[in-house]
Design a protein with these regions (language model features):
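A short core secondary-structure module
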Residues: 146-147, 151-195
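Short, surface-exposed charged micro-motifs
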Residues: 138-140
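A short, Trp-centered hydrophobic/proline-enriched beta-strand micro-motif
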Residues: 117-125, 169
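Flexible, small-/acidic-enriched active-site or ligand-binding loops
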Residues: 136, 189-220
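Short Gly/Pro-enriched turn/cap motifs at secondary-structure boundaries
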Residues: 87-88, 114, 129-132, 156-159, ...
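Helix-loop "lid/cap" segments that line or gate small-molecule binding pockets
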Residues: 92-101
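Alpha-helical interface subdomain recognition
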Residues: 1-81, 88, 101-106, 113-118, ...
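Short Ser/Thr-interspersed hydrophobic loop/turn segments at strand-loop and sheet-helix junctions
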Residues: 48, 71-76, 170, 186-191, ...
């Protein structure tokens, strides 16, 4: 992927924003289990960082996705996983379908304030019994006059405790699972919505997560994105941006793991020599850096195809699979070289070790990615190429 001066200017803007507005507070926010999301999003919105590839008509920059990929990569310089995940929910999970298929009225009501950072969004897909199995979700939105009446619940919803709206995937008919779902924009202040207490997660500690319940929640049918029954297809498209964001976002974070480990191993001496002089260690770090470059190349190739309008299902799935597995590999190896210090809760590599584990679970588990790749290779049993 060829970067222009405009790409590099955006890269500098994101990095300065992270350096001055986020990283000085990460330790505090990680301990608190939350960060001031409205404040940070408003500041990001003022810089245009929440609408890079969104339509100019609604306040976005109108740039192609290569710029969004650059921003996602630079958000990886945040010294925790929870905050970039919350940003990714706003930019690449709860708004792509709205931006692409939503009515002008819906985009004015929800997309514009999401781009400016005045409103925080969340995405409502996963349920207790339907995580990667999106077709199996049970939440319903039944017609009643000009409204939908929504009942059910959504689980592990990032940003939900502070969200102003949710982009909700629900069953709007009794038809077949892949054609009975719709995406509906629902204000979180709508009567009948309630939340669980904050979920206590292994990692991504600074992002807020809860279960969301819907008890006869009534919203106008005009809040539906696009045609009724097209929600599953839209969500599959939305997943592509989520997976590209997640993979791009991993690159700089993994490099930070390696860089901080190198610095520690230069200072730490055992048996009279610096740890970094141990061939096992410096060879392993070289291997891991090489793998990160492979991930970067895969992300860039997928992004190039995406901005050309090509189907990136295969490459986005591969990039997400590679990112999740490499994240575990890098953080585990680096933690080992920190020894007992790596086992301490506040150690940066220990935090990465906890945070990156979600990448192989959320947004489609590794096993789902493998199934997609196998299907496209023509080797998934019972499936034709």
């Amino acid at each position: 992927m060829i970067f222009t001066p405009e790409h590099e200017a955006l890269r500098r803007t994101v990095r300065q924003f992270v350096t001055h507005e986020i990283n000085p507070h990460v330790e505090e926010w990680e301990k608190a289990g939350r960060f001031p999301i409205h404040e940070i999003f408003r500041k990001a919105g003022e810089l245009g960082l929440l609408g890079i590839s969104k339509p100019e008509k609604f306040g976005g920059m109108g740039l192609d996705y290569s710029y969004s990929s650059v921003a996602a990569e630079e958000f990886g310089t945040i010294h925790c996983g929870g905050i970039p995940m919350s940003i990714g929910v706003q930019t690449d999970m709860c708004t792509p379908a709205l931006a692409r298929f939503g009515s002008d009225e819906l985009r004015e009501e929800f997309l514009r304030p999401a781009i400016t950072g005045e409103q925080v969004g969340c995405i409502g897909v996963s349920e207790v019994g339907a995580g990667s199995d999106v077709a199996g979700l049970k939440t319903t939105a039944r017609k009643d006059g000009d409204d939908y009446v929504i009942n059910g619940s959504k689980m592990w919803i990032t940003n939900s405790p502070s969200a102003d709206f949710i982009c909700l995937l629900a069953n709007t008919s009794d038809d077949k699972p892949h054609i009975n779902k719709s995406l509906i924009m629902v204000p979180m202040t709508t009567p009948g919505i309630s939340l669980s207490s904050h979920l206590d997660k292994l990692g991504m500690r600074s992002s807020e997560t809860a279960q969301v319940f819907f008890d006869n929640v009534r919203v106008p049918q005009r809040n539906r994105i696009g045609h009724e029954g097209a929600g599953f297809m839209m969500q599959m498209l939305q997943f592509q941006e989520e997976r590209l964001f997640g993979a791009a976002n991993m690159i700089k974070g993994l490099e930070y793991c390696i860089d901080s480990t190198i610095e520690y191993c230069k200072e730490r001496k055992t048996f009279g020599n610096a740890l970094i002089d141990n061939q096992v260690i410096h060879f392993r770090l070289a291997e891991l850096q090489t793998e990160i470059e492979c991930l970067r190349a895969l992300v860039y190739q997928a992004t190039e195809q995406y901005i050309k309008g090509q189907d990136v299902t295969r490459l986005a799935s591969m990039a997400k699979l590679k990112a999740g597995r490499l994240g575990r590999e890098v953080s585990d190896s680096c933690l080992q070289y920190w020894g007992g210090m790596g086992f301490m809760w506040d150690n940066p590599v220990a935090r990465a070790y906890r945070d990156v584990r979600l990448v192989s679970i959320g947004g489609g588990a590794d096993e789902i990615m493998l199934g997609i790749i196998c299907k496209l290779m023509g080797i998934l049993p019972g499936k034709k190429k």
